[in-house]
Amino acid sequence: MKKIYDMLKLENIKILPGVKDWREAIHVAVKPLVDGGYCEERYGDEIIKNTEKLGPYYVLCENVALIHGSTEQGVIKRQIAITLLKEPVKFKEDGYDVRI
């Protein structure tokens, strides 16, 4: 069984000034996973499709979103990436500000 610290690599942690919108936030958040071979290129687009269909169900609370997907959406191996935004982004107009 993989331990959580085995699924979080230093190269998958990013601190960024901000993004233009929630779609860009998803793409920059999954980029380290794509680059590392943990998911397919389409992974970010699949999460965006789910968000457009179901809403931002992964926004847990103020400042925190836990975007995720499945093998059907392009996940190859389990891995965690953390993206910290200095300027928050909203995943819906009346929703929480998200930084992580």
Predicted regions and their residues:
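Cytosolic covalent-transfer regions centered on His/Cys nucleophiles
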Residues: M1-I100
